[in-house]
Amino acid sequence: MEDFVRQCFNPMIVELAEKAMKEYGEDPKIETNKFAAICTHLEVCFMYSDFHFIDERGESIIVESGDPNALLKHRFEIIEGRDRTMAWTVVNSICNTTGVEKPKFLPDLYDYKENRFIEIGVTRREVHIYYLEKANKIKSEKTHIHIFSFTGEEMATKADYTLDEESRARIKTRLFTIRQEMASRGLWDSFRQSERGEETIEERFEITGTMRRLADQSLPPNFSSLENFRAYVDGFEPNGCIEGKLSQMSKEVNARIDPFLRTTPRPLRLPEGPPCSQRSKFLLMDALKLSIEDPSHEGEGIPLYDAIKCMKTFFGWKEPNIVKPHERGINPNYLLAWKQVLAELQDIENEDKIPKTKNMKKTSQLKWALGENMAPEKLDFEDCKNVSDLKQYDSDEPEQRSLASWVQSEFNKACELTESSWIELDEIGEDVAPIEHIASMRRNYFTAEVSHCRATEYIMKGVYINTALLNASCAAMDDFQLIPMISKCRTKEGRRKTNLYGFIIKGRSHLRNDTDVVNFVSMEFSLTDPRLEPHKWEKYCVLEIGDMLLRTAIGQVLRPMFLYVRTNGTSKIKMKWGMEMRRCLLQSLQQIESMIEAESSVKEKDMTKEFFENKSETWPIGESPKGVEEGSIGKVCRTLLAKSVFNSLYASPQLEGFSAESRKLLLIVQALRDNLEPGTFDLGGLYEAIEECLINDPWVLLNASWFNSFLTHALK
């Protein structure tokens, strides 16, 4: 289409159209239909005015060639095609000299013979529909409207066609030719369907009563009334320089706009320091499950019953010992806590009837691990406001940490497929409305791509743990309740499976506010030796608790089984969000949908089936030091899901800040790639805002490192 436009229209028209699009931040290379429409409209405006003059007697005449010395004045003033400032200047000057009412919107022409502005319309739809839209938009009796269509129809205000038959026939013939040329190149259908209706701007409605008083109270200083403020705002030229706008606003502001070039941006500075450590609420790639297939035991579905059944599948328990102590904790207490869990589970089995929940004895090791009686005593402010040296605790700045390789490994693992399916087809939720076939189809394709993904396992594990912990926090506030960490899935053959990852012991939980903290101790099974990456496990005390027989390619091997124990905490609001982790599925489905939509609008048909079934096509997944990584559509689905899940698992103020601030830099870089010549002021301040979020959070550090890869490749 772009080539067609450049061949078909006069270069001056093409240049004007490009300028107009650039003024509104649109790209002629991308919005090619719009490009063609603007050129067509410009050409019709020029043809409308061509050869029409007013002679000395004030009569309208048509002169195609003739005496260059004749005293002729152009009958039409062309307003369309000028830049906005110039166009309004022309309109204002016409209004001042002729006394015609000033139009609300920029018209296309002024007719000196009839003394009226003219709005020209060129439509690919029905002329009367377009005429009504135009009339509705400009709502002015004074501006004359004249609409042409590509099928040779026309419509004008009061059927007054302004021009003679022959001049109008020239315009209609030209439009018909453009249509045929487009059709012969297969461009017409797309062009015809891409026409949008006129955007009508809401009429100003009168504000009265309370709203009026509130409006008057909330004006910026120095404005006496709402009208006076509106007039000021309307006086801003939409494309004046930013510097000008700023200087109008305040005498103190002085901004110098610096051009943003390919050489301008520098990489983000990542912090230095010891490598960052794992901070998720439960183990991810390092978790180990004890599982039962086709569970049918008595009390199946009751977490404690399921947990005991899973524990019984393992026979390699041994006397536990500490292999990686916690730097600052009392490590023997962690060891005693695990022994206590084993002993109390044994006690349950010796009882006649297994209880549905288990509250642990409040031993000294658990009291220590759960921070019992550790909180400083709270005093009423009235009682202590007279204390002379009352002060807030000094809190240390968080220690800076560097990015460690384990974070990328965790992410890669989250994108992988597992042997089991973690969600049923309807997990994303049926739509309430009688959903069209397409949406269900998309959902089913997407579910098929992600149901076996490890990120989906993390979702279900997170939902289970948070739900169980929130329930126990409300139901057993004072008890140290033992909560098994469980998930359910289906094997390749479709058999049900229940998995136990370990246990949580919850501390006292009188949670009044959303942010009140409940402490818990987590104990999770793993085959990962903590001594390989000790920095990752800084917050854990790790015990060796057994040996597991594993089937490998070379036969059976005996591997030590570890227990990762740590004290942790969460709050009502965090548990509420944890329970809603299934939203990650929805978020990534919507991202995939927008990709399908983009593809479908180019091809002008629904591309869902081709999108998911064309296995040969690859899609961009992300940036790495090697360049843009590509993969199958399934890989894209799983990567988007993993990102969404990690945003939930590693949610933090650092992530919020980094996402918001880095997005600004991203948009500037994208504008540069789209040749929009962006300018910036205080780029240093933006870098500062981004980098103050890079402290010690593993997920934020990984995202920053990805951002740097993106910068490198985007600016090549």
UniProtKB/Swiss-Prot annotation:
Pfam family, one: Flu_PA
GO annotation terms (biological process): cap snatching; DNA-templated transcription; symbiont-mediated suppression of host gene expression; symbiont-mediated suppression of host mRNA transcription via inhibition of RNA polymerase II activity; viral RNA genome replication; viral translational frameshifting
The keyword Manganese is assigned to this record: yes
Domain of life from the UniProt record: Viruses
Chain positions recorded as Mn(2+) 1 binding sites: 41, 108, 119-120
GO cellular component: host cell cytoplasm; host cell nucleus
Residue positions of motif Nuclear localization signal 1 (NLS1): 124-139
Disulphide connectivity of cysteines: none
GO molecular function: endonuclease activity; metal ion binding; RNA binding
Gene3D superfamilies: Influenza RNA-dependent RNA polymerase subunit PA, endonuclease domain
E.C. number: 3.1.-.-
Function, as annotated: Plays an essential role in viral RNA transcription and replication by forming the heterotrimeric polymerase complex together with PB1 and PB2 subunits. The complex transcribes viral mRNAs by using a unique mechanism called cap-snatching. It consists in the hijacking and cleavage of host capped pre-mRNAs. These short capped RNAs are then used as primers for viral mRNAs. The PB2 subunit is responsible for the binding of the 5' cap of cellular pre-mRNAs which are subsequently cleaved after 10-13 nucleotides by the PA subunit that carries the endonuclease activity.
Protein name per its UniProtKB record: Polymerase acidic protein
Source organism of the structure: Influenza A virus (strain A/Gull/Minnesota/945/1980 H13N6)
Upper taxonomic lineage: Viruses, Riboviria, Orthornavirae, Negarnaviricota, Polyploviricotina
